[in-house]
Regions:
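Short Pro/Gly-enriched beta-strand edge/turn motifs at strand-loop
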Residues: 14-21
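Metal- or metallocofactor-binding catalytic centers and their adjacent structured scaffolds
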Residues: 6, 38-119
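Catalytic core of soluble alpha/beta enzymes
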Residues: 174-309
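Conserved, mostly hydrophobic/aromatic
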Residues: 4, 42, 68, 108, ...
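Catalytic domains of carbohydrate-active enzymes, especially glycoside hydrolases
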Residues: 162-175
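Active-site mouth loops of central-metabolism enzymes
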Residues: 98, 135-157, 176-178, 205-211, ...
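Glycine-rich, aromatic-flanked loop segments that form ligand/cofactor-binding clefts
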Residues: 109-145
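Flexible C-terminal active-site loop/helix
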Residues: 2-5, 12, 26, 32, ...
Length: 378
């Protein structure tokens, strides 16, 4: 028995040194919510999730404390599926975006799993299946340089050196989609020349292209001798799964998507439509590890590989637990100071792989001083 007594949330917000621009979005802060589920037995489940800035950060925390916590008080945290189903009704409000509630559930579900792992003395990657104890890591970069002079102009090369030389990562997810295809190809060629042929590349348009633009990009990249591990979110939202399928079939390229879905239902539609080769469903946004594992089970029936959108501290456990896992992802320290500074016992890569901890639960020790220094509620 793990009787839930209370839930604590701590919002974190760290301003970034400059604006990071993707296709149609900009990032100025790195944010997270630290969630702690306290039990009567003294075990505390702890996790951080939900990379959302204000006002959504406050909205998610309000859902946790005003709606989820009253439902869970007195419940047994070791009955994880029951806890998840107990939380599900908060998604039924049709006048509120459903993904707000799914992110709130994700925060609590992750912390509940951490508590359960601690109670049974097992790390989550092993508890969830234990397929391997380390996962290859790729970096995320290639953001567009601002025109205000705040950056030097050699950021692509510096990022690659950080990922490849300093940390031994096996590849890079490269941002495209804000420029014309030929301009993005030129940026990718520059990156490939600097990185060398053994460094793999994924491209991520963040829904920036039309189908035609995505196909032009692929043709030009191939003419330069560049092969991609996959093409992530190549097309705009209104094309739905059909556009992804068109790029996949007409472009003869592996397509990844899923981070913009917030439940297994949306992932089911993508898989049934033959739209993706790789799911990058995000457990920290979409209902937590419980929902991610449902997506993973479904993906195995469709021969779809598994990634995880960002959040290496959680994605590594999930991807290590299943046969179809691909790469865990990490930003540079400027883009994600939380990953590089919050986790006290973050391991160094071994031959390009991120080792999983043997400690129970998620196994991470969070830096209390860092949390206190970057609280957004003070």
């Amino acid at each position: 028995m793990l009787t839930i007594e209370s839930i604590e949330t701590i919002p974190l917000r760290i301003p970034l040194p400059f604006t990071y621009k993707g296709s149609y979005y900009e990032m100025r802060n790195r944010c997270a919510i630290v969630t702690r589920v306290r039990t009567a037995e003294g075990i505390v489940g702890e996790a951080y999730n939900a990379d959302e800035d204000e006002p959504l950060q406050s909205e998610i925390r309000a859902i946790i404390h005003d709606e989820l916590e009253p439902l869970l008080l007195g419940q047994d945290a070791s009955l994880v599926e029951r806890c998840w189903q107990t939380m599900l009704p908060v998604t039924f409000d049709q006048l509120r975006p459903r993904w707000y509630a799914m992110q709130a559930i994700a925060c609590v579900d992750t912390a509940i799993w951490d508590a359960f792992g601690k109670a049974v003395g097992q790390p989550l990657w092993r508890l969830w299946g234990g397929y391997r104890d380390r996962v290859p890591m790729i970096g995320i970069g290639g953001y567009y340089v601002p025109s205000d002079g705040s950056q030097k102009g050699n950021e692509i090369e510096d990022e690659i050196d950080f990922f490849r030389l300093e940390h031994g990562m096996v590849g890079m997810k490269f941002k495209i989609g804000a420029k014309l295809p030929q301009d993005d190809v030129a940026r990718l060629v520059r990156a490939r020349r600097h990185a060398g042929d053994e460094f793999l590349f994924v491209v991520d348009a963040n829904q920036g292209y039309t189908v035609s633009e995505a196909l032009v990009f692929l043709g030009m990249a191939r003419a330069e001798g560049i092969e991609l591990r996959w093409f992530e979110e190549p097309t705009r939202w209104h094309g739905d799964a059909r556009s992804l399928r068109d790029v996949r079939m007409r472009g003869n390229v592996a397509v990844a998507a899923g981070q913009s879905e917030h439940s297994r239902v949306g992932m089911r539609e993508m898989m049934v439509a033959g739209a993706i080769d790789v799911s990058n469903f995000d457990a920290s946004w979409g209902g937590g590890p419980t929902e991610w594992r449902r997506v993973a089970a479904m993906a195995s029936a469709f021969d779809v590989e598994l990634g995880h959108h960002e959040e290496a501290h959680l994605g590594s456990h999930l991807l290590a637990s299943v046969p179809g896992g691909t790469f865990v992802e990490a930003f540079s320290p400027d883009r994600d100071p939380i990953f590089w500074n919050l986790i006290v016992n973050r391991p160094e890569l071994v031959d390009g792989h991120f080792p999983l901890p043997d400690r129970p639960g998620l196994g991470w020790e969070l830096d209390e001083d860092y949390i206190e220094a970057h609280r957004a509620d003070r």
